[in-house]
């Protein structure tokens, strides 16, 4: 019989608490972050219509890390490219949803990259 992972359950509780308070609108959509052990994913969501407006990840075919290496550098690059795509789609302001993760490491790096790219949150 499989045991439930306590970290996963605690993160699910954090996500539900955060989602009660945060909701993206068409004027200010929600920037959602998900990370796995190897990759990081970010998307900008309009919760009113239930649609994903812009997305970027390290799995994306257009993702190129270049000379840099490491997961935090990749997260920062994802943030910069996501911000470029968002400004092309006419999105300037977002609400940051860290997805139950602590604001440290790859999550922080992604948000800093998005800010450098021109997003305001």
From Swiss-Prot:
Keywords: Ribonucleoprotein, Ribosomal protein, RNA-binding, rRNA-binding. It comes from the Bacteria. GO terms for biological process: translation. The keyword RNA-binding applies. The keyword RNA-binding applies. GO terms for molecular function: 5S rRNA binding; structural constituent of ribosome. GO terms for cellular component: cytosolic large ribosomal subunit. Part of the 50S ribosomal subunit; part of the 5S rRNA/L5/L18/L25 subcomplex. Contacts the 5S and 23S rRNAs. Belongs to the universal ribosomal protein uL18 family. HAMAP family: Ribosomal_uL18_B. PANTHER family: 39S RIBOSOMAL PROTEIN L18, MITOCHONDRIAL, LARGE RIBOSOMAL SUBUNIT PROTEIN UL18M. This is one of the proteins that bind and probably mediate the attachment of the 5S RNA into the large ribosomal subunit, where it forms part of the central protuberance. This is Large ribosomal subunit protein uL18. The gene is rplR.
């Amino acid at each position: 019989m499989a045991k439930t992972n306590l970290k996963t359950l605690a993160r699910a509780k954090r996500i539900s608490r955060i989602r009660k308070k945060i909701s993206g609108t068409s004027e200010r959509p929600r920037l959602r972050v998900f990370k796995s052990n190897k990759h990081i994913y970010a998307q900008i969501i309009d919760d009113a219509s239930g649609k994903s407006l812009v997305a970027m990840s390290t799995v994306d075919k257009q993702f190129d890390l270049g000379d840099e290496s490491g997961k935090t550098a990749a997260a920062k690059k994802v943030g910069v490219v996501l911000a470029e795509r968002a400004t092309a789609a006419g999105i300037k302001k977002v609400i940051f949803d860290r997805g139950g993760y602590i604001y440290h490491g790859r999550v922080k790096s992604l948000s800093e990259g998005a800010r450098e790219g021109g997003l305001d949150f």
